[in-house]
């Protein structure tokens, strides 16, 4: 029997579709749409019913409330806060005091009883959610505060919750909004969804977006997860785990998780007892250090996210990224989707215009001016006077263009946020209220700083920067920056491939929107120093170090702070460890206790120390490879010098003190040495994970500082020992051309490797025999020197003769567009640049190609 939906008071969720927003509200219409279309594809959605907007109006008229409400609100001055609060309270109490028409009450109870039967219980636990139905409001988020009542059990309690939802249409904020914009209070309806609760109080919950929310990058699903019911995450009171899944290889069947970050999940909301429907409890310490979801669950959610996005994109006739709420039932151990709505910020963006915020103040100077740091929202920068607010009661002090600094925000803060140049909060994550609103307003926000309200004072000038990757910084005073706006439609594409040098995986999604042909140099060093932080040999020999520490402690050879003399470390180390320790450091004192504690803290939750290194490195590489997929991404194996490796945790134990590290134990010579070989093996395993497990076969590798062809052959042999074979599954191996020997013997290197990448920085130093860090000779350092240019021209010629690819990843073409033109003249295949010089160099290359007749 077909239902006349336009008059219905109550409908099952699968009776409504997205076209029914006027009677069912956006949330319920979306649930109905998914149950009808996506449940058959395996997406699990809890069942329920909708008390329609017709029922709301019927309730108002049955209780003669329209005139009474109009009367209460007559002559309201919305600037008089006390008067507003008094009248708002009166309206809400009036609605709560109303009675349901008997037929409506009976229908609501009848549907509740049938829902209980469906779930084989006499009184099913439900979530009761309001959903405003105003179609003509320009910003429906202000139509009514969306109330949610969780763990409602029993028909009578459902009726009370529905009444509370009706009353939520008249929160003070909603009244102000409609009064200010001249909307009729009764043109805005409300529908209420009654949906089976998912027992996420015993499991986990969160949100997922089918794009990267900060950059609008389309090819990922970003999932946030926390323990318990979802309210704390939405309110920003816990920092959730974050998982990123790459869509193109996920849909080919790969385990495409390209990033996992552990959140600070110290509290959770669970079911309460008696009158207390829900309560907040602490999460046990061991659970805080675990991920809320396992890999299979992450992949399952991501696949559902893609299915939901595909459905809505098809329905709307355009790409429609989605914002989806999910929950994991801890009793059933099953995942469910509980809500989905289109993501509104990036889907409306102009795709061809890129704005790039560039900081001009030097990094050294900025470092000393950091007040607090947290999670960056967006990629902009703002400067202004800080206004620290602890309470909304102080909101009237807030001036247009100030920077809002507060503990946490909720929807009641939105009128203040709309006036802010930027937002800084103590608490909250990427999906907290402050982050969502900042994105919608297009202003930078730094959330989850921990202590901004203590560190920042009202009236002081500060700069909020979200233009430095995933970490947002708040600086003292004004930081110098510029904004470049580029219309990509106006950029002609050269024949020479234009690639990028990327070190920080956090900036990869942002830079991928620039015109490019891939990444000519992806550096591992940033990932190792910032993600991993621990020397690879300290991880591989952790158990040996622990055993050594216990031995030394038994002998009372460690002081109260944890220090021990290096010569004692040599003396007591077992054979395995002793062979790897640095020599000649007898007199040095080392804090062995701190090294072990730091390693233990960073690697907690990983099955073993080597896995920590391999996974962390693979996530960093994968993020870059995914951002530029399917274009090639050339990953240079680690090229730290011994003094740089020594700065890593535990590095002091294993790294020699060299007079000239730049010419010492670095690059290829490390990879096959008995001391370092096993550490290099972990790098190989990380690449295998990225290519074979995640499906990112656009990843290629490059050997730095390879002094002789024989060294090159030895490295390829070690790679094979660890399962990474040149040519297997299309793997290409390049060599850095940064030593004169690489160019003099280019014909021999060409028979070993698939291609060359010119490292013009070291090549210039080694050709001219100078140290560019020495101010006495630095004035002679110039990549445009005739000797350097002749070597480069010779290499390009040899590479062409042997059918090998040749590119450049050094600094020169980024700094000097005329140098890029010289490379084009020589017939180079690709030029890899720093992201901030891609566009100007591209124009210089196009100009030269036109001159040479390569480009018409």
UniProtKB/Swiss-Prot annotation:
PROSITE patterns: PEP_ENZYMES_2 (PS00742), PEP_ENZYMES_PHOS_SITE (PS00370). Pfam families: PEP-utilizers (PF00391), PEP-utilizers_C (PF02896), PPDK_N (PF01326). InterPro entries: ATP_grasp_subdomain_1, PEP-util_enz_mobile_dom, PEP_synth, PEP_util_AS, PEP_util_C, PEP_util_CS, Phosphohistidine_dom_sf, PPDK_AMP/ATP-bd. It comes from the Bacteria. Belongs to the PEP-utilizing enzyme family. Its cofactor is Mg(2+). The keyword Magnesium applies. It catalyses: pyruvate + ATP + H2O = phosphoenolpyruvate + AMP + phosphate + 2 H(+). GO terms for biological process: gluconeogenesis. The N-terminal domain contains the ATP/Pi binding site, the central domain the pyrophosphate/phosphate carrier histidine, and the C-terminal domain the pyruvate binding site. Catalyzes the phosphorylation of pyruvate to phosphoenolpyruvate. It comes from Aquifex aeolicus (strain VF5). Substrate binds at residues 523, 636, 738, 759-762. The reaction takes place in three steps, mediated by a phosphocarrier histidine residue located on the surface of the central domain. The two first partial reactions are catalyzed at an active site located on the N-terminal domain, and the third partial reaction is catalyzed at an active site located on the C-terminal domain. For catalytic turnover, the central domain swivels from the concave surface of the N-terminal domain to that of the C-terminal domain. Mg(2+) binds at residues 738, 762. One of its GO terms (molecular function) is metal ion binding. Its EC number is 2.7.9.2. This is Phosphoenolpyruvate synthase. The active site is at 433 (tele-phosphohistidine intermediate), 809 (proton donor). Pathway: Carbohydrate biosynthesis; gluconeogenesis. Keywords: ATP-binding, Kinase, Magnesium, Metal-binding, Nucleotide-binding, Transferase.
